[in-house]
């Protein structure tokens, strides 16, 4: 394929695909004629990439009487504090966070003792993953924070891989290719659990939008790859989505995958958050599988101070960290 003159971006062994880029569409016609190529599909149209500007730091988070800081309620609702009291805090477990960027994780004082094994950017390998979106940073904080009386996450002694697959400036199928490459990479480095607070159903090209009947665990590439990761022994934890109050309402791939854990959101009283996406899958499986705090979740902000945020993006890592501690036990 490279000999045709295209640039290979990522490959996927589990689903047997290659993602390429080129400026000459006739090269795709040449690739389509190769005897080992089953089909081709356009998954992305190039746009000018914009660079994130680093947010300024304050690095003065408020200390509290509680060991967990303000995160005590979201920890206690999942009972992870009981696991911690028993000595199970995620030590020896490896978690991959597949997300958007991890803004300022390398600069925030309260995050400097997180055990990060490595980073990989599948969207733009030359980019600084710590200067991209803040979404993955806040997701990571729900699990990995380990600052007594500031914030303790649900798996503070686990080790983490930070993997970027989401391009915040567009919604294209290529992001699922990046995600597939990321989860296969996670498998290759021995990851135990994957948290992904991502999901897709609507794209820049409306012809690519998913329909409810597509939520069968097999239609979307991400869902197939997530199921294969589970088959290989990884625990895949995924946000249900935030469309519960909108017209779509349903979970989003890869949340429809078989044998993964899809997490909805509740408030700190245990009441379902109105935005939390619902099931079932198109083939009748109950989703989401579990819920955790996702309304007014306590997370780290890009300035190094704590903030509150809404979304199943945060209930998912809260649950993922608890599962890591339970597995350790």
Regions found by a protein language model. Give the residues of each.
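Short acidic, glycine-rich surface-loop motifs adjacent to enzyme active sites
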Residues: 160, 165, 184-216, 239
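Subtilisin-like serine protease catalytic core
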Residues: 82-120, 125-175, 189-192, 205, ...
């Amino acid at each position: 394929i490279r000999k045709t003159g295209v640039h290979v971006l990522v490959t996927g062994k589990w689903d047997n695909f290659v993602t390429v880029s080129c400026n000459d569409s006739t090269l795709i016609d040449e690739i389509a004629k190769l005897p080992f190529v089953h089909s081709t599909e356009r998954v992305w149209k190039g746009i000018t990439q914009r660079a994130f500007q680093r947010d300024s730091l304050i690095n003065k988070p408020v200390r509290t009487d509680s060991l967990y800081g303000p995160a005590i309620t979201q920890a206690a609702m999942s009972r992870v504090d009981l696991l911690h009291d028993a000595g199970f805090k995620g030590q020896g477990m490896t978690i991959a966070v597949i997300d958007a960027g991890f803004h300022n994780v390398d600069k925030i004082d309260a995050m400097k003792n997180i055990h990060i094994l490595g980073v990989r950017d599948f969207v733009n390998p030359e980019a600084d993953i710590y200067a991209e979106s803040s979404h993955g940073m806040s997701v990571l904080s729900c699990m990995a924070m380990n600052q007594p009386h500031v914030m303790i996450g649900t798996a503070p002694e686990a080790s983490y891989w930070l993997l970027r697959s989401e391009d915040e400036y567009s919604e294209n199928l290529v992001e699922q290719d990046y995600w597939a490459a990321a989860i296969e990479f996670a498998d290759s480095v021995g990851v135990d659990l994957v948290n992904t607070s991502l999901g897709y159903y609507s794209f820049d090209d409306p012809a690519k939008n998913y329909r409810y009947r597509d939520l069968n665990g097999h239609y979307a590439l991400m869902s197939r790859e997530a199921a294969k990761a589970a088959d290989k022994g990884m625990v895949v934890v995924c946000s249900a989505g935030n469309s519960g109050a909108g017209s779509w309402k349903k979970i989003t791939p890869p949340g429809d995958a078989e044998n993964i854990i899809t997490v909805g959101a509740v408030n700190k009283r245990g009441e379902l958050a109105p935005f939390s996406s619902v099931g079932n899958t198109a083939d009748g499986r109950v989703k989401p599988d579990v819920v955790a705090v996702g309304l007014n979740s306590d997370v780290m902000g890009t300035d190094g101070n704590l903030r509150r945020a809404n979304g199943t993006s945060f209930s998912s890592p809260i649950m993922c960290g608890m599962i890591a501690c339970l597995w350790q036990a």
